[in-house]
Structure formats: C-alpha cells, structure tokens
Amino acid sequence: MTLWLGPGPLVLASQSRARQALLSNAGIPFDAIPADIDERGIAKASGLSAPGEIAALLAQEKAAFVSNHHPGRLVLGADQTLALGARGFNKPADRNEAAKQLRELAGRRHELHAAIALVRNGVTLFADVSIARMTMRPLNDEEIAAYLDLAGDKATSSVGGYQVEGLGVHLFDGIHGDHFTILGLPLLPLLGFLRSQKLLAF
C-alpha cells in the first residue's frame, strides 16, 4: 500500500534538514528545491512587524518562487520567526551575535512562529501559522560560552542560536507547543490538508 497518492513528489522549498527529516519520517515523498529569495529584503519591504505575519509572508514567497519555476508541482514553503515580546530575531551572523541573542533570551520566554504555505501554479491552496512558547533558563556568560563551544556552527544556523532537537535542549526550563512547530514545520495541519485533498491513503 502507498501512503502518498499525489501525481508526483511534493516540492519542499527549503534546505532545512529538520524539515526534510520531518517529511521523510511522515512518509511524504519530496524533492528539496530551496527558494533563492532575499528574505530580509522582502520582510523589510513588506512593512510588516508581527513575527507571525512575517513568517507567513516568507513561507508564501518561498513557495511562490519555486512554484513559478516548477509549474504543475505542489510546492511547500516554510518559515520560522522568533519573537521576544515585540522584537523579532534573525539568524545570528557569527558566534558573537549568537552569544548576544542567548544573553537576551536567557531567563525569559520567547515565541517561535512557524508558517507553511502550499502553492501550485502560483496559487496558494493552504496556509497555516503555529506558535510555540519557549522558556530559556537563566544562563551566565560561562555557560553560554560552553554551549557555543560544543554547538559549533549549529549555533549560527538557527534563529536564537540554538537547535532544540540537539544540544539546544539544555538551554530550556520549559517548552509549550507542538514539537513540529518548534522544528519549523507545523506537520499536523499540513497532513490534515493533504488528507482533505485525498493525497494521503489515510
């Protein structure tokens, strides 16, 4: 029996290993084709400030970009933003910026906004934004330095300077939200839509 009933593999407009692993583990065949867009430029030009709205816009833009180059294919775009109060964060450019972000987040609760958009032939068929709330434990400079030493390049590959599926889990006191949302791909609403479109066997 085949789970996926689509005419061809889904297209994932992302190079995120976490997102690719989530789709693979769920049995969804896909081709990973990252979108070549200027995320910061698009977000700035939009005038949007709400993290969830920015994530939704970027997920849509990624999917639309790849859809324009692959007509007829079902394209999944995804994006995730981090907000501490009203302030949004970007991926740290280097270790120093990662340390700065961790100092700001330590001992406080922040939100992760994960957005997805499904697009075919430039038309958005489905979109969703999910939120997870993350409470980082208090950290001193020595603990932050130790974490960054161990995390290496992974500290600059994710917003906030951490990957909660790895060593980043040691930074937290509390996590409230969907596991898939935290990893940047709200899988349950995605699967629900695919089922509604008769693209899954069950």
Curated annotation (Swiss-Prot):
GO biological process terms on file: nucleotide metabolic process
EC number of the protein: 3.6.1.9
Enzyme class, UniProt record, top EC level? hydrolase
Source organism's superkingdom? Answer: Bacteria
Reactions catalysed, semicolon-separated, are: a ribonucleoside 5'-triphosphate + H2O = a ribonucleoside 5'-phosphate + diphosphate + H(+); a 2'-deoxyribonucleoside 5'-triphosphate + H2O = a 2'-deoxyribonucleoside 5'-phosphate + diphosphate + H(+)
List, alphabetically, the InterPro entries matched. Answer: ITPase-like_fam, Maf-like
Keyword field: Cytoplasm, Hydrolase, Nucleotide metabolism
Co-factor requirement: a divalent metal cation
- What's one GO MF term for it? nucleoside triphosphate diphosphatase activity
- A GO CC term attached to the entry: cytoplasm
Q: Which cell locations does it reside in?
A: Cytoplasm
In terms of Pfam families, this protein maps to: Maf (PF02545)
Catalytic residues, chain numbering: D79
Q: Which family does it belong to?
A: Belongs to the Maf family.
Described by its record, this protein's role is as follows:
Nucleoside triphosphate pyrophosphatase. May have a dual role in cell division arrest and in preventing the incorporation of modified nucleotides into cellular nucleic acids.
Q: What is this protein called?
A: Nucleoside triphosphate pyrophosphatase
- Organism of derivation: Rhodopseudomonas palustris (strain HaA2)
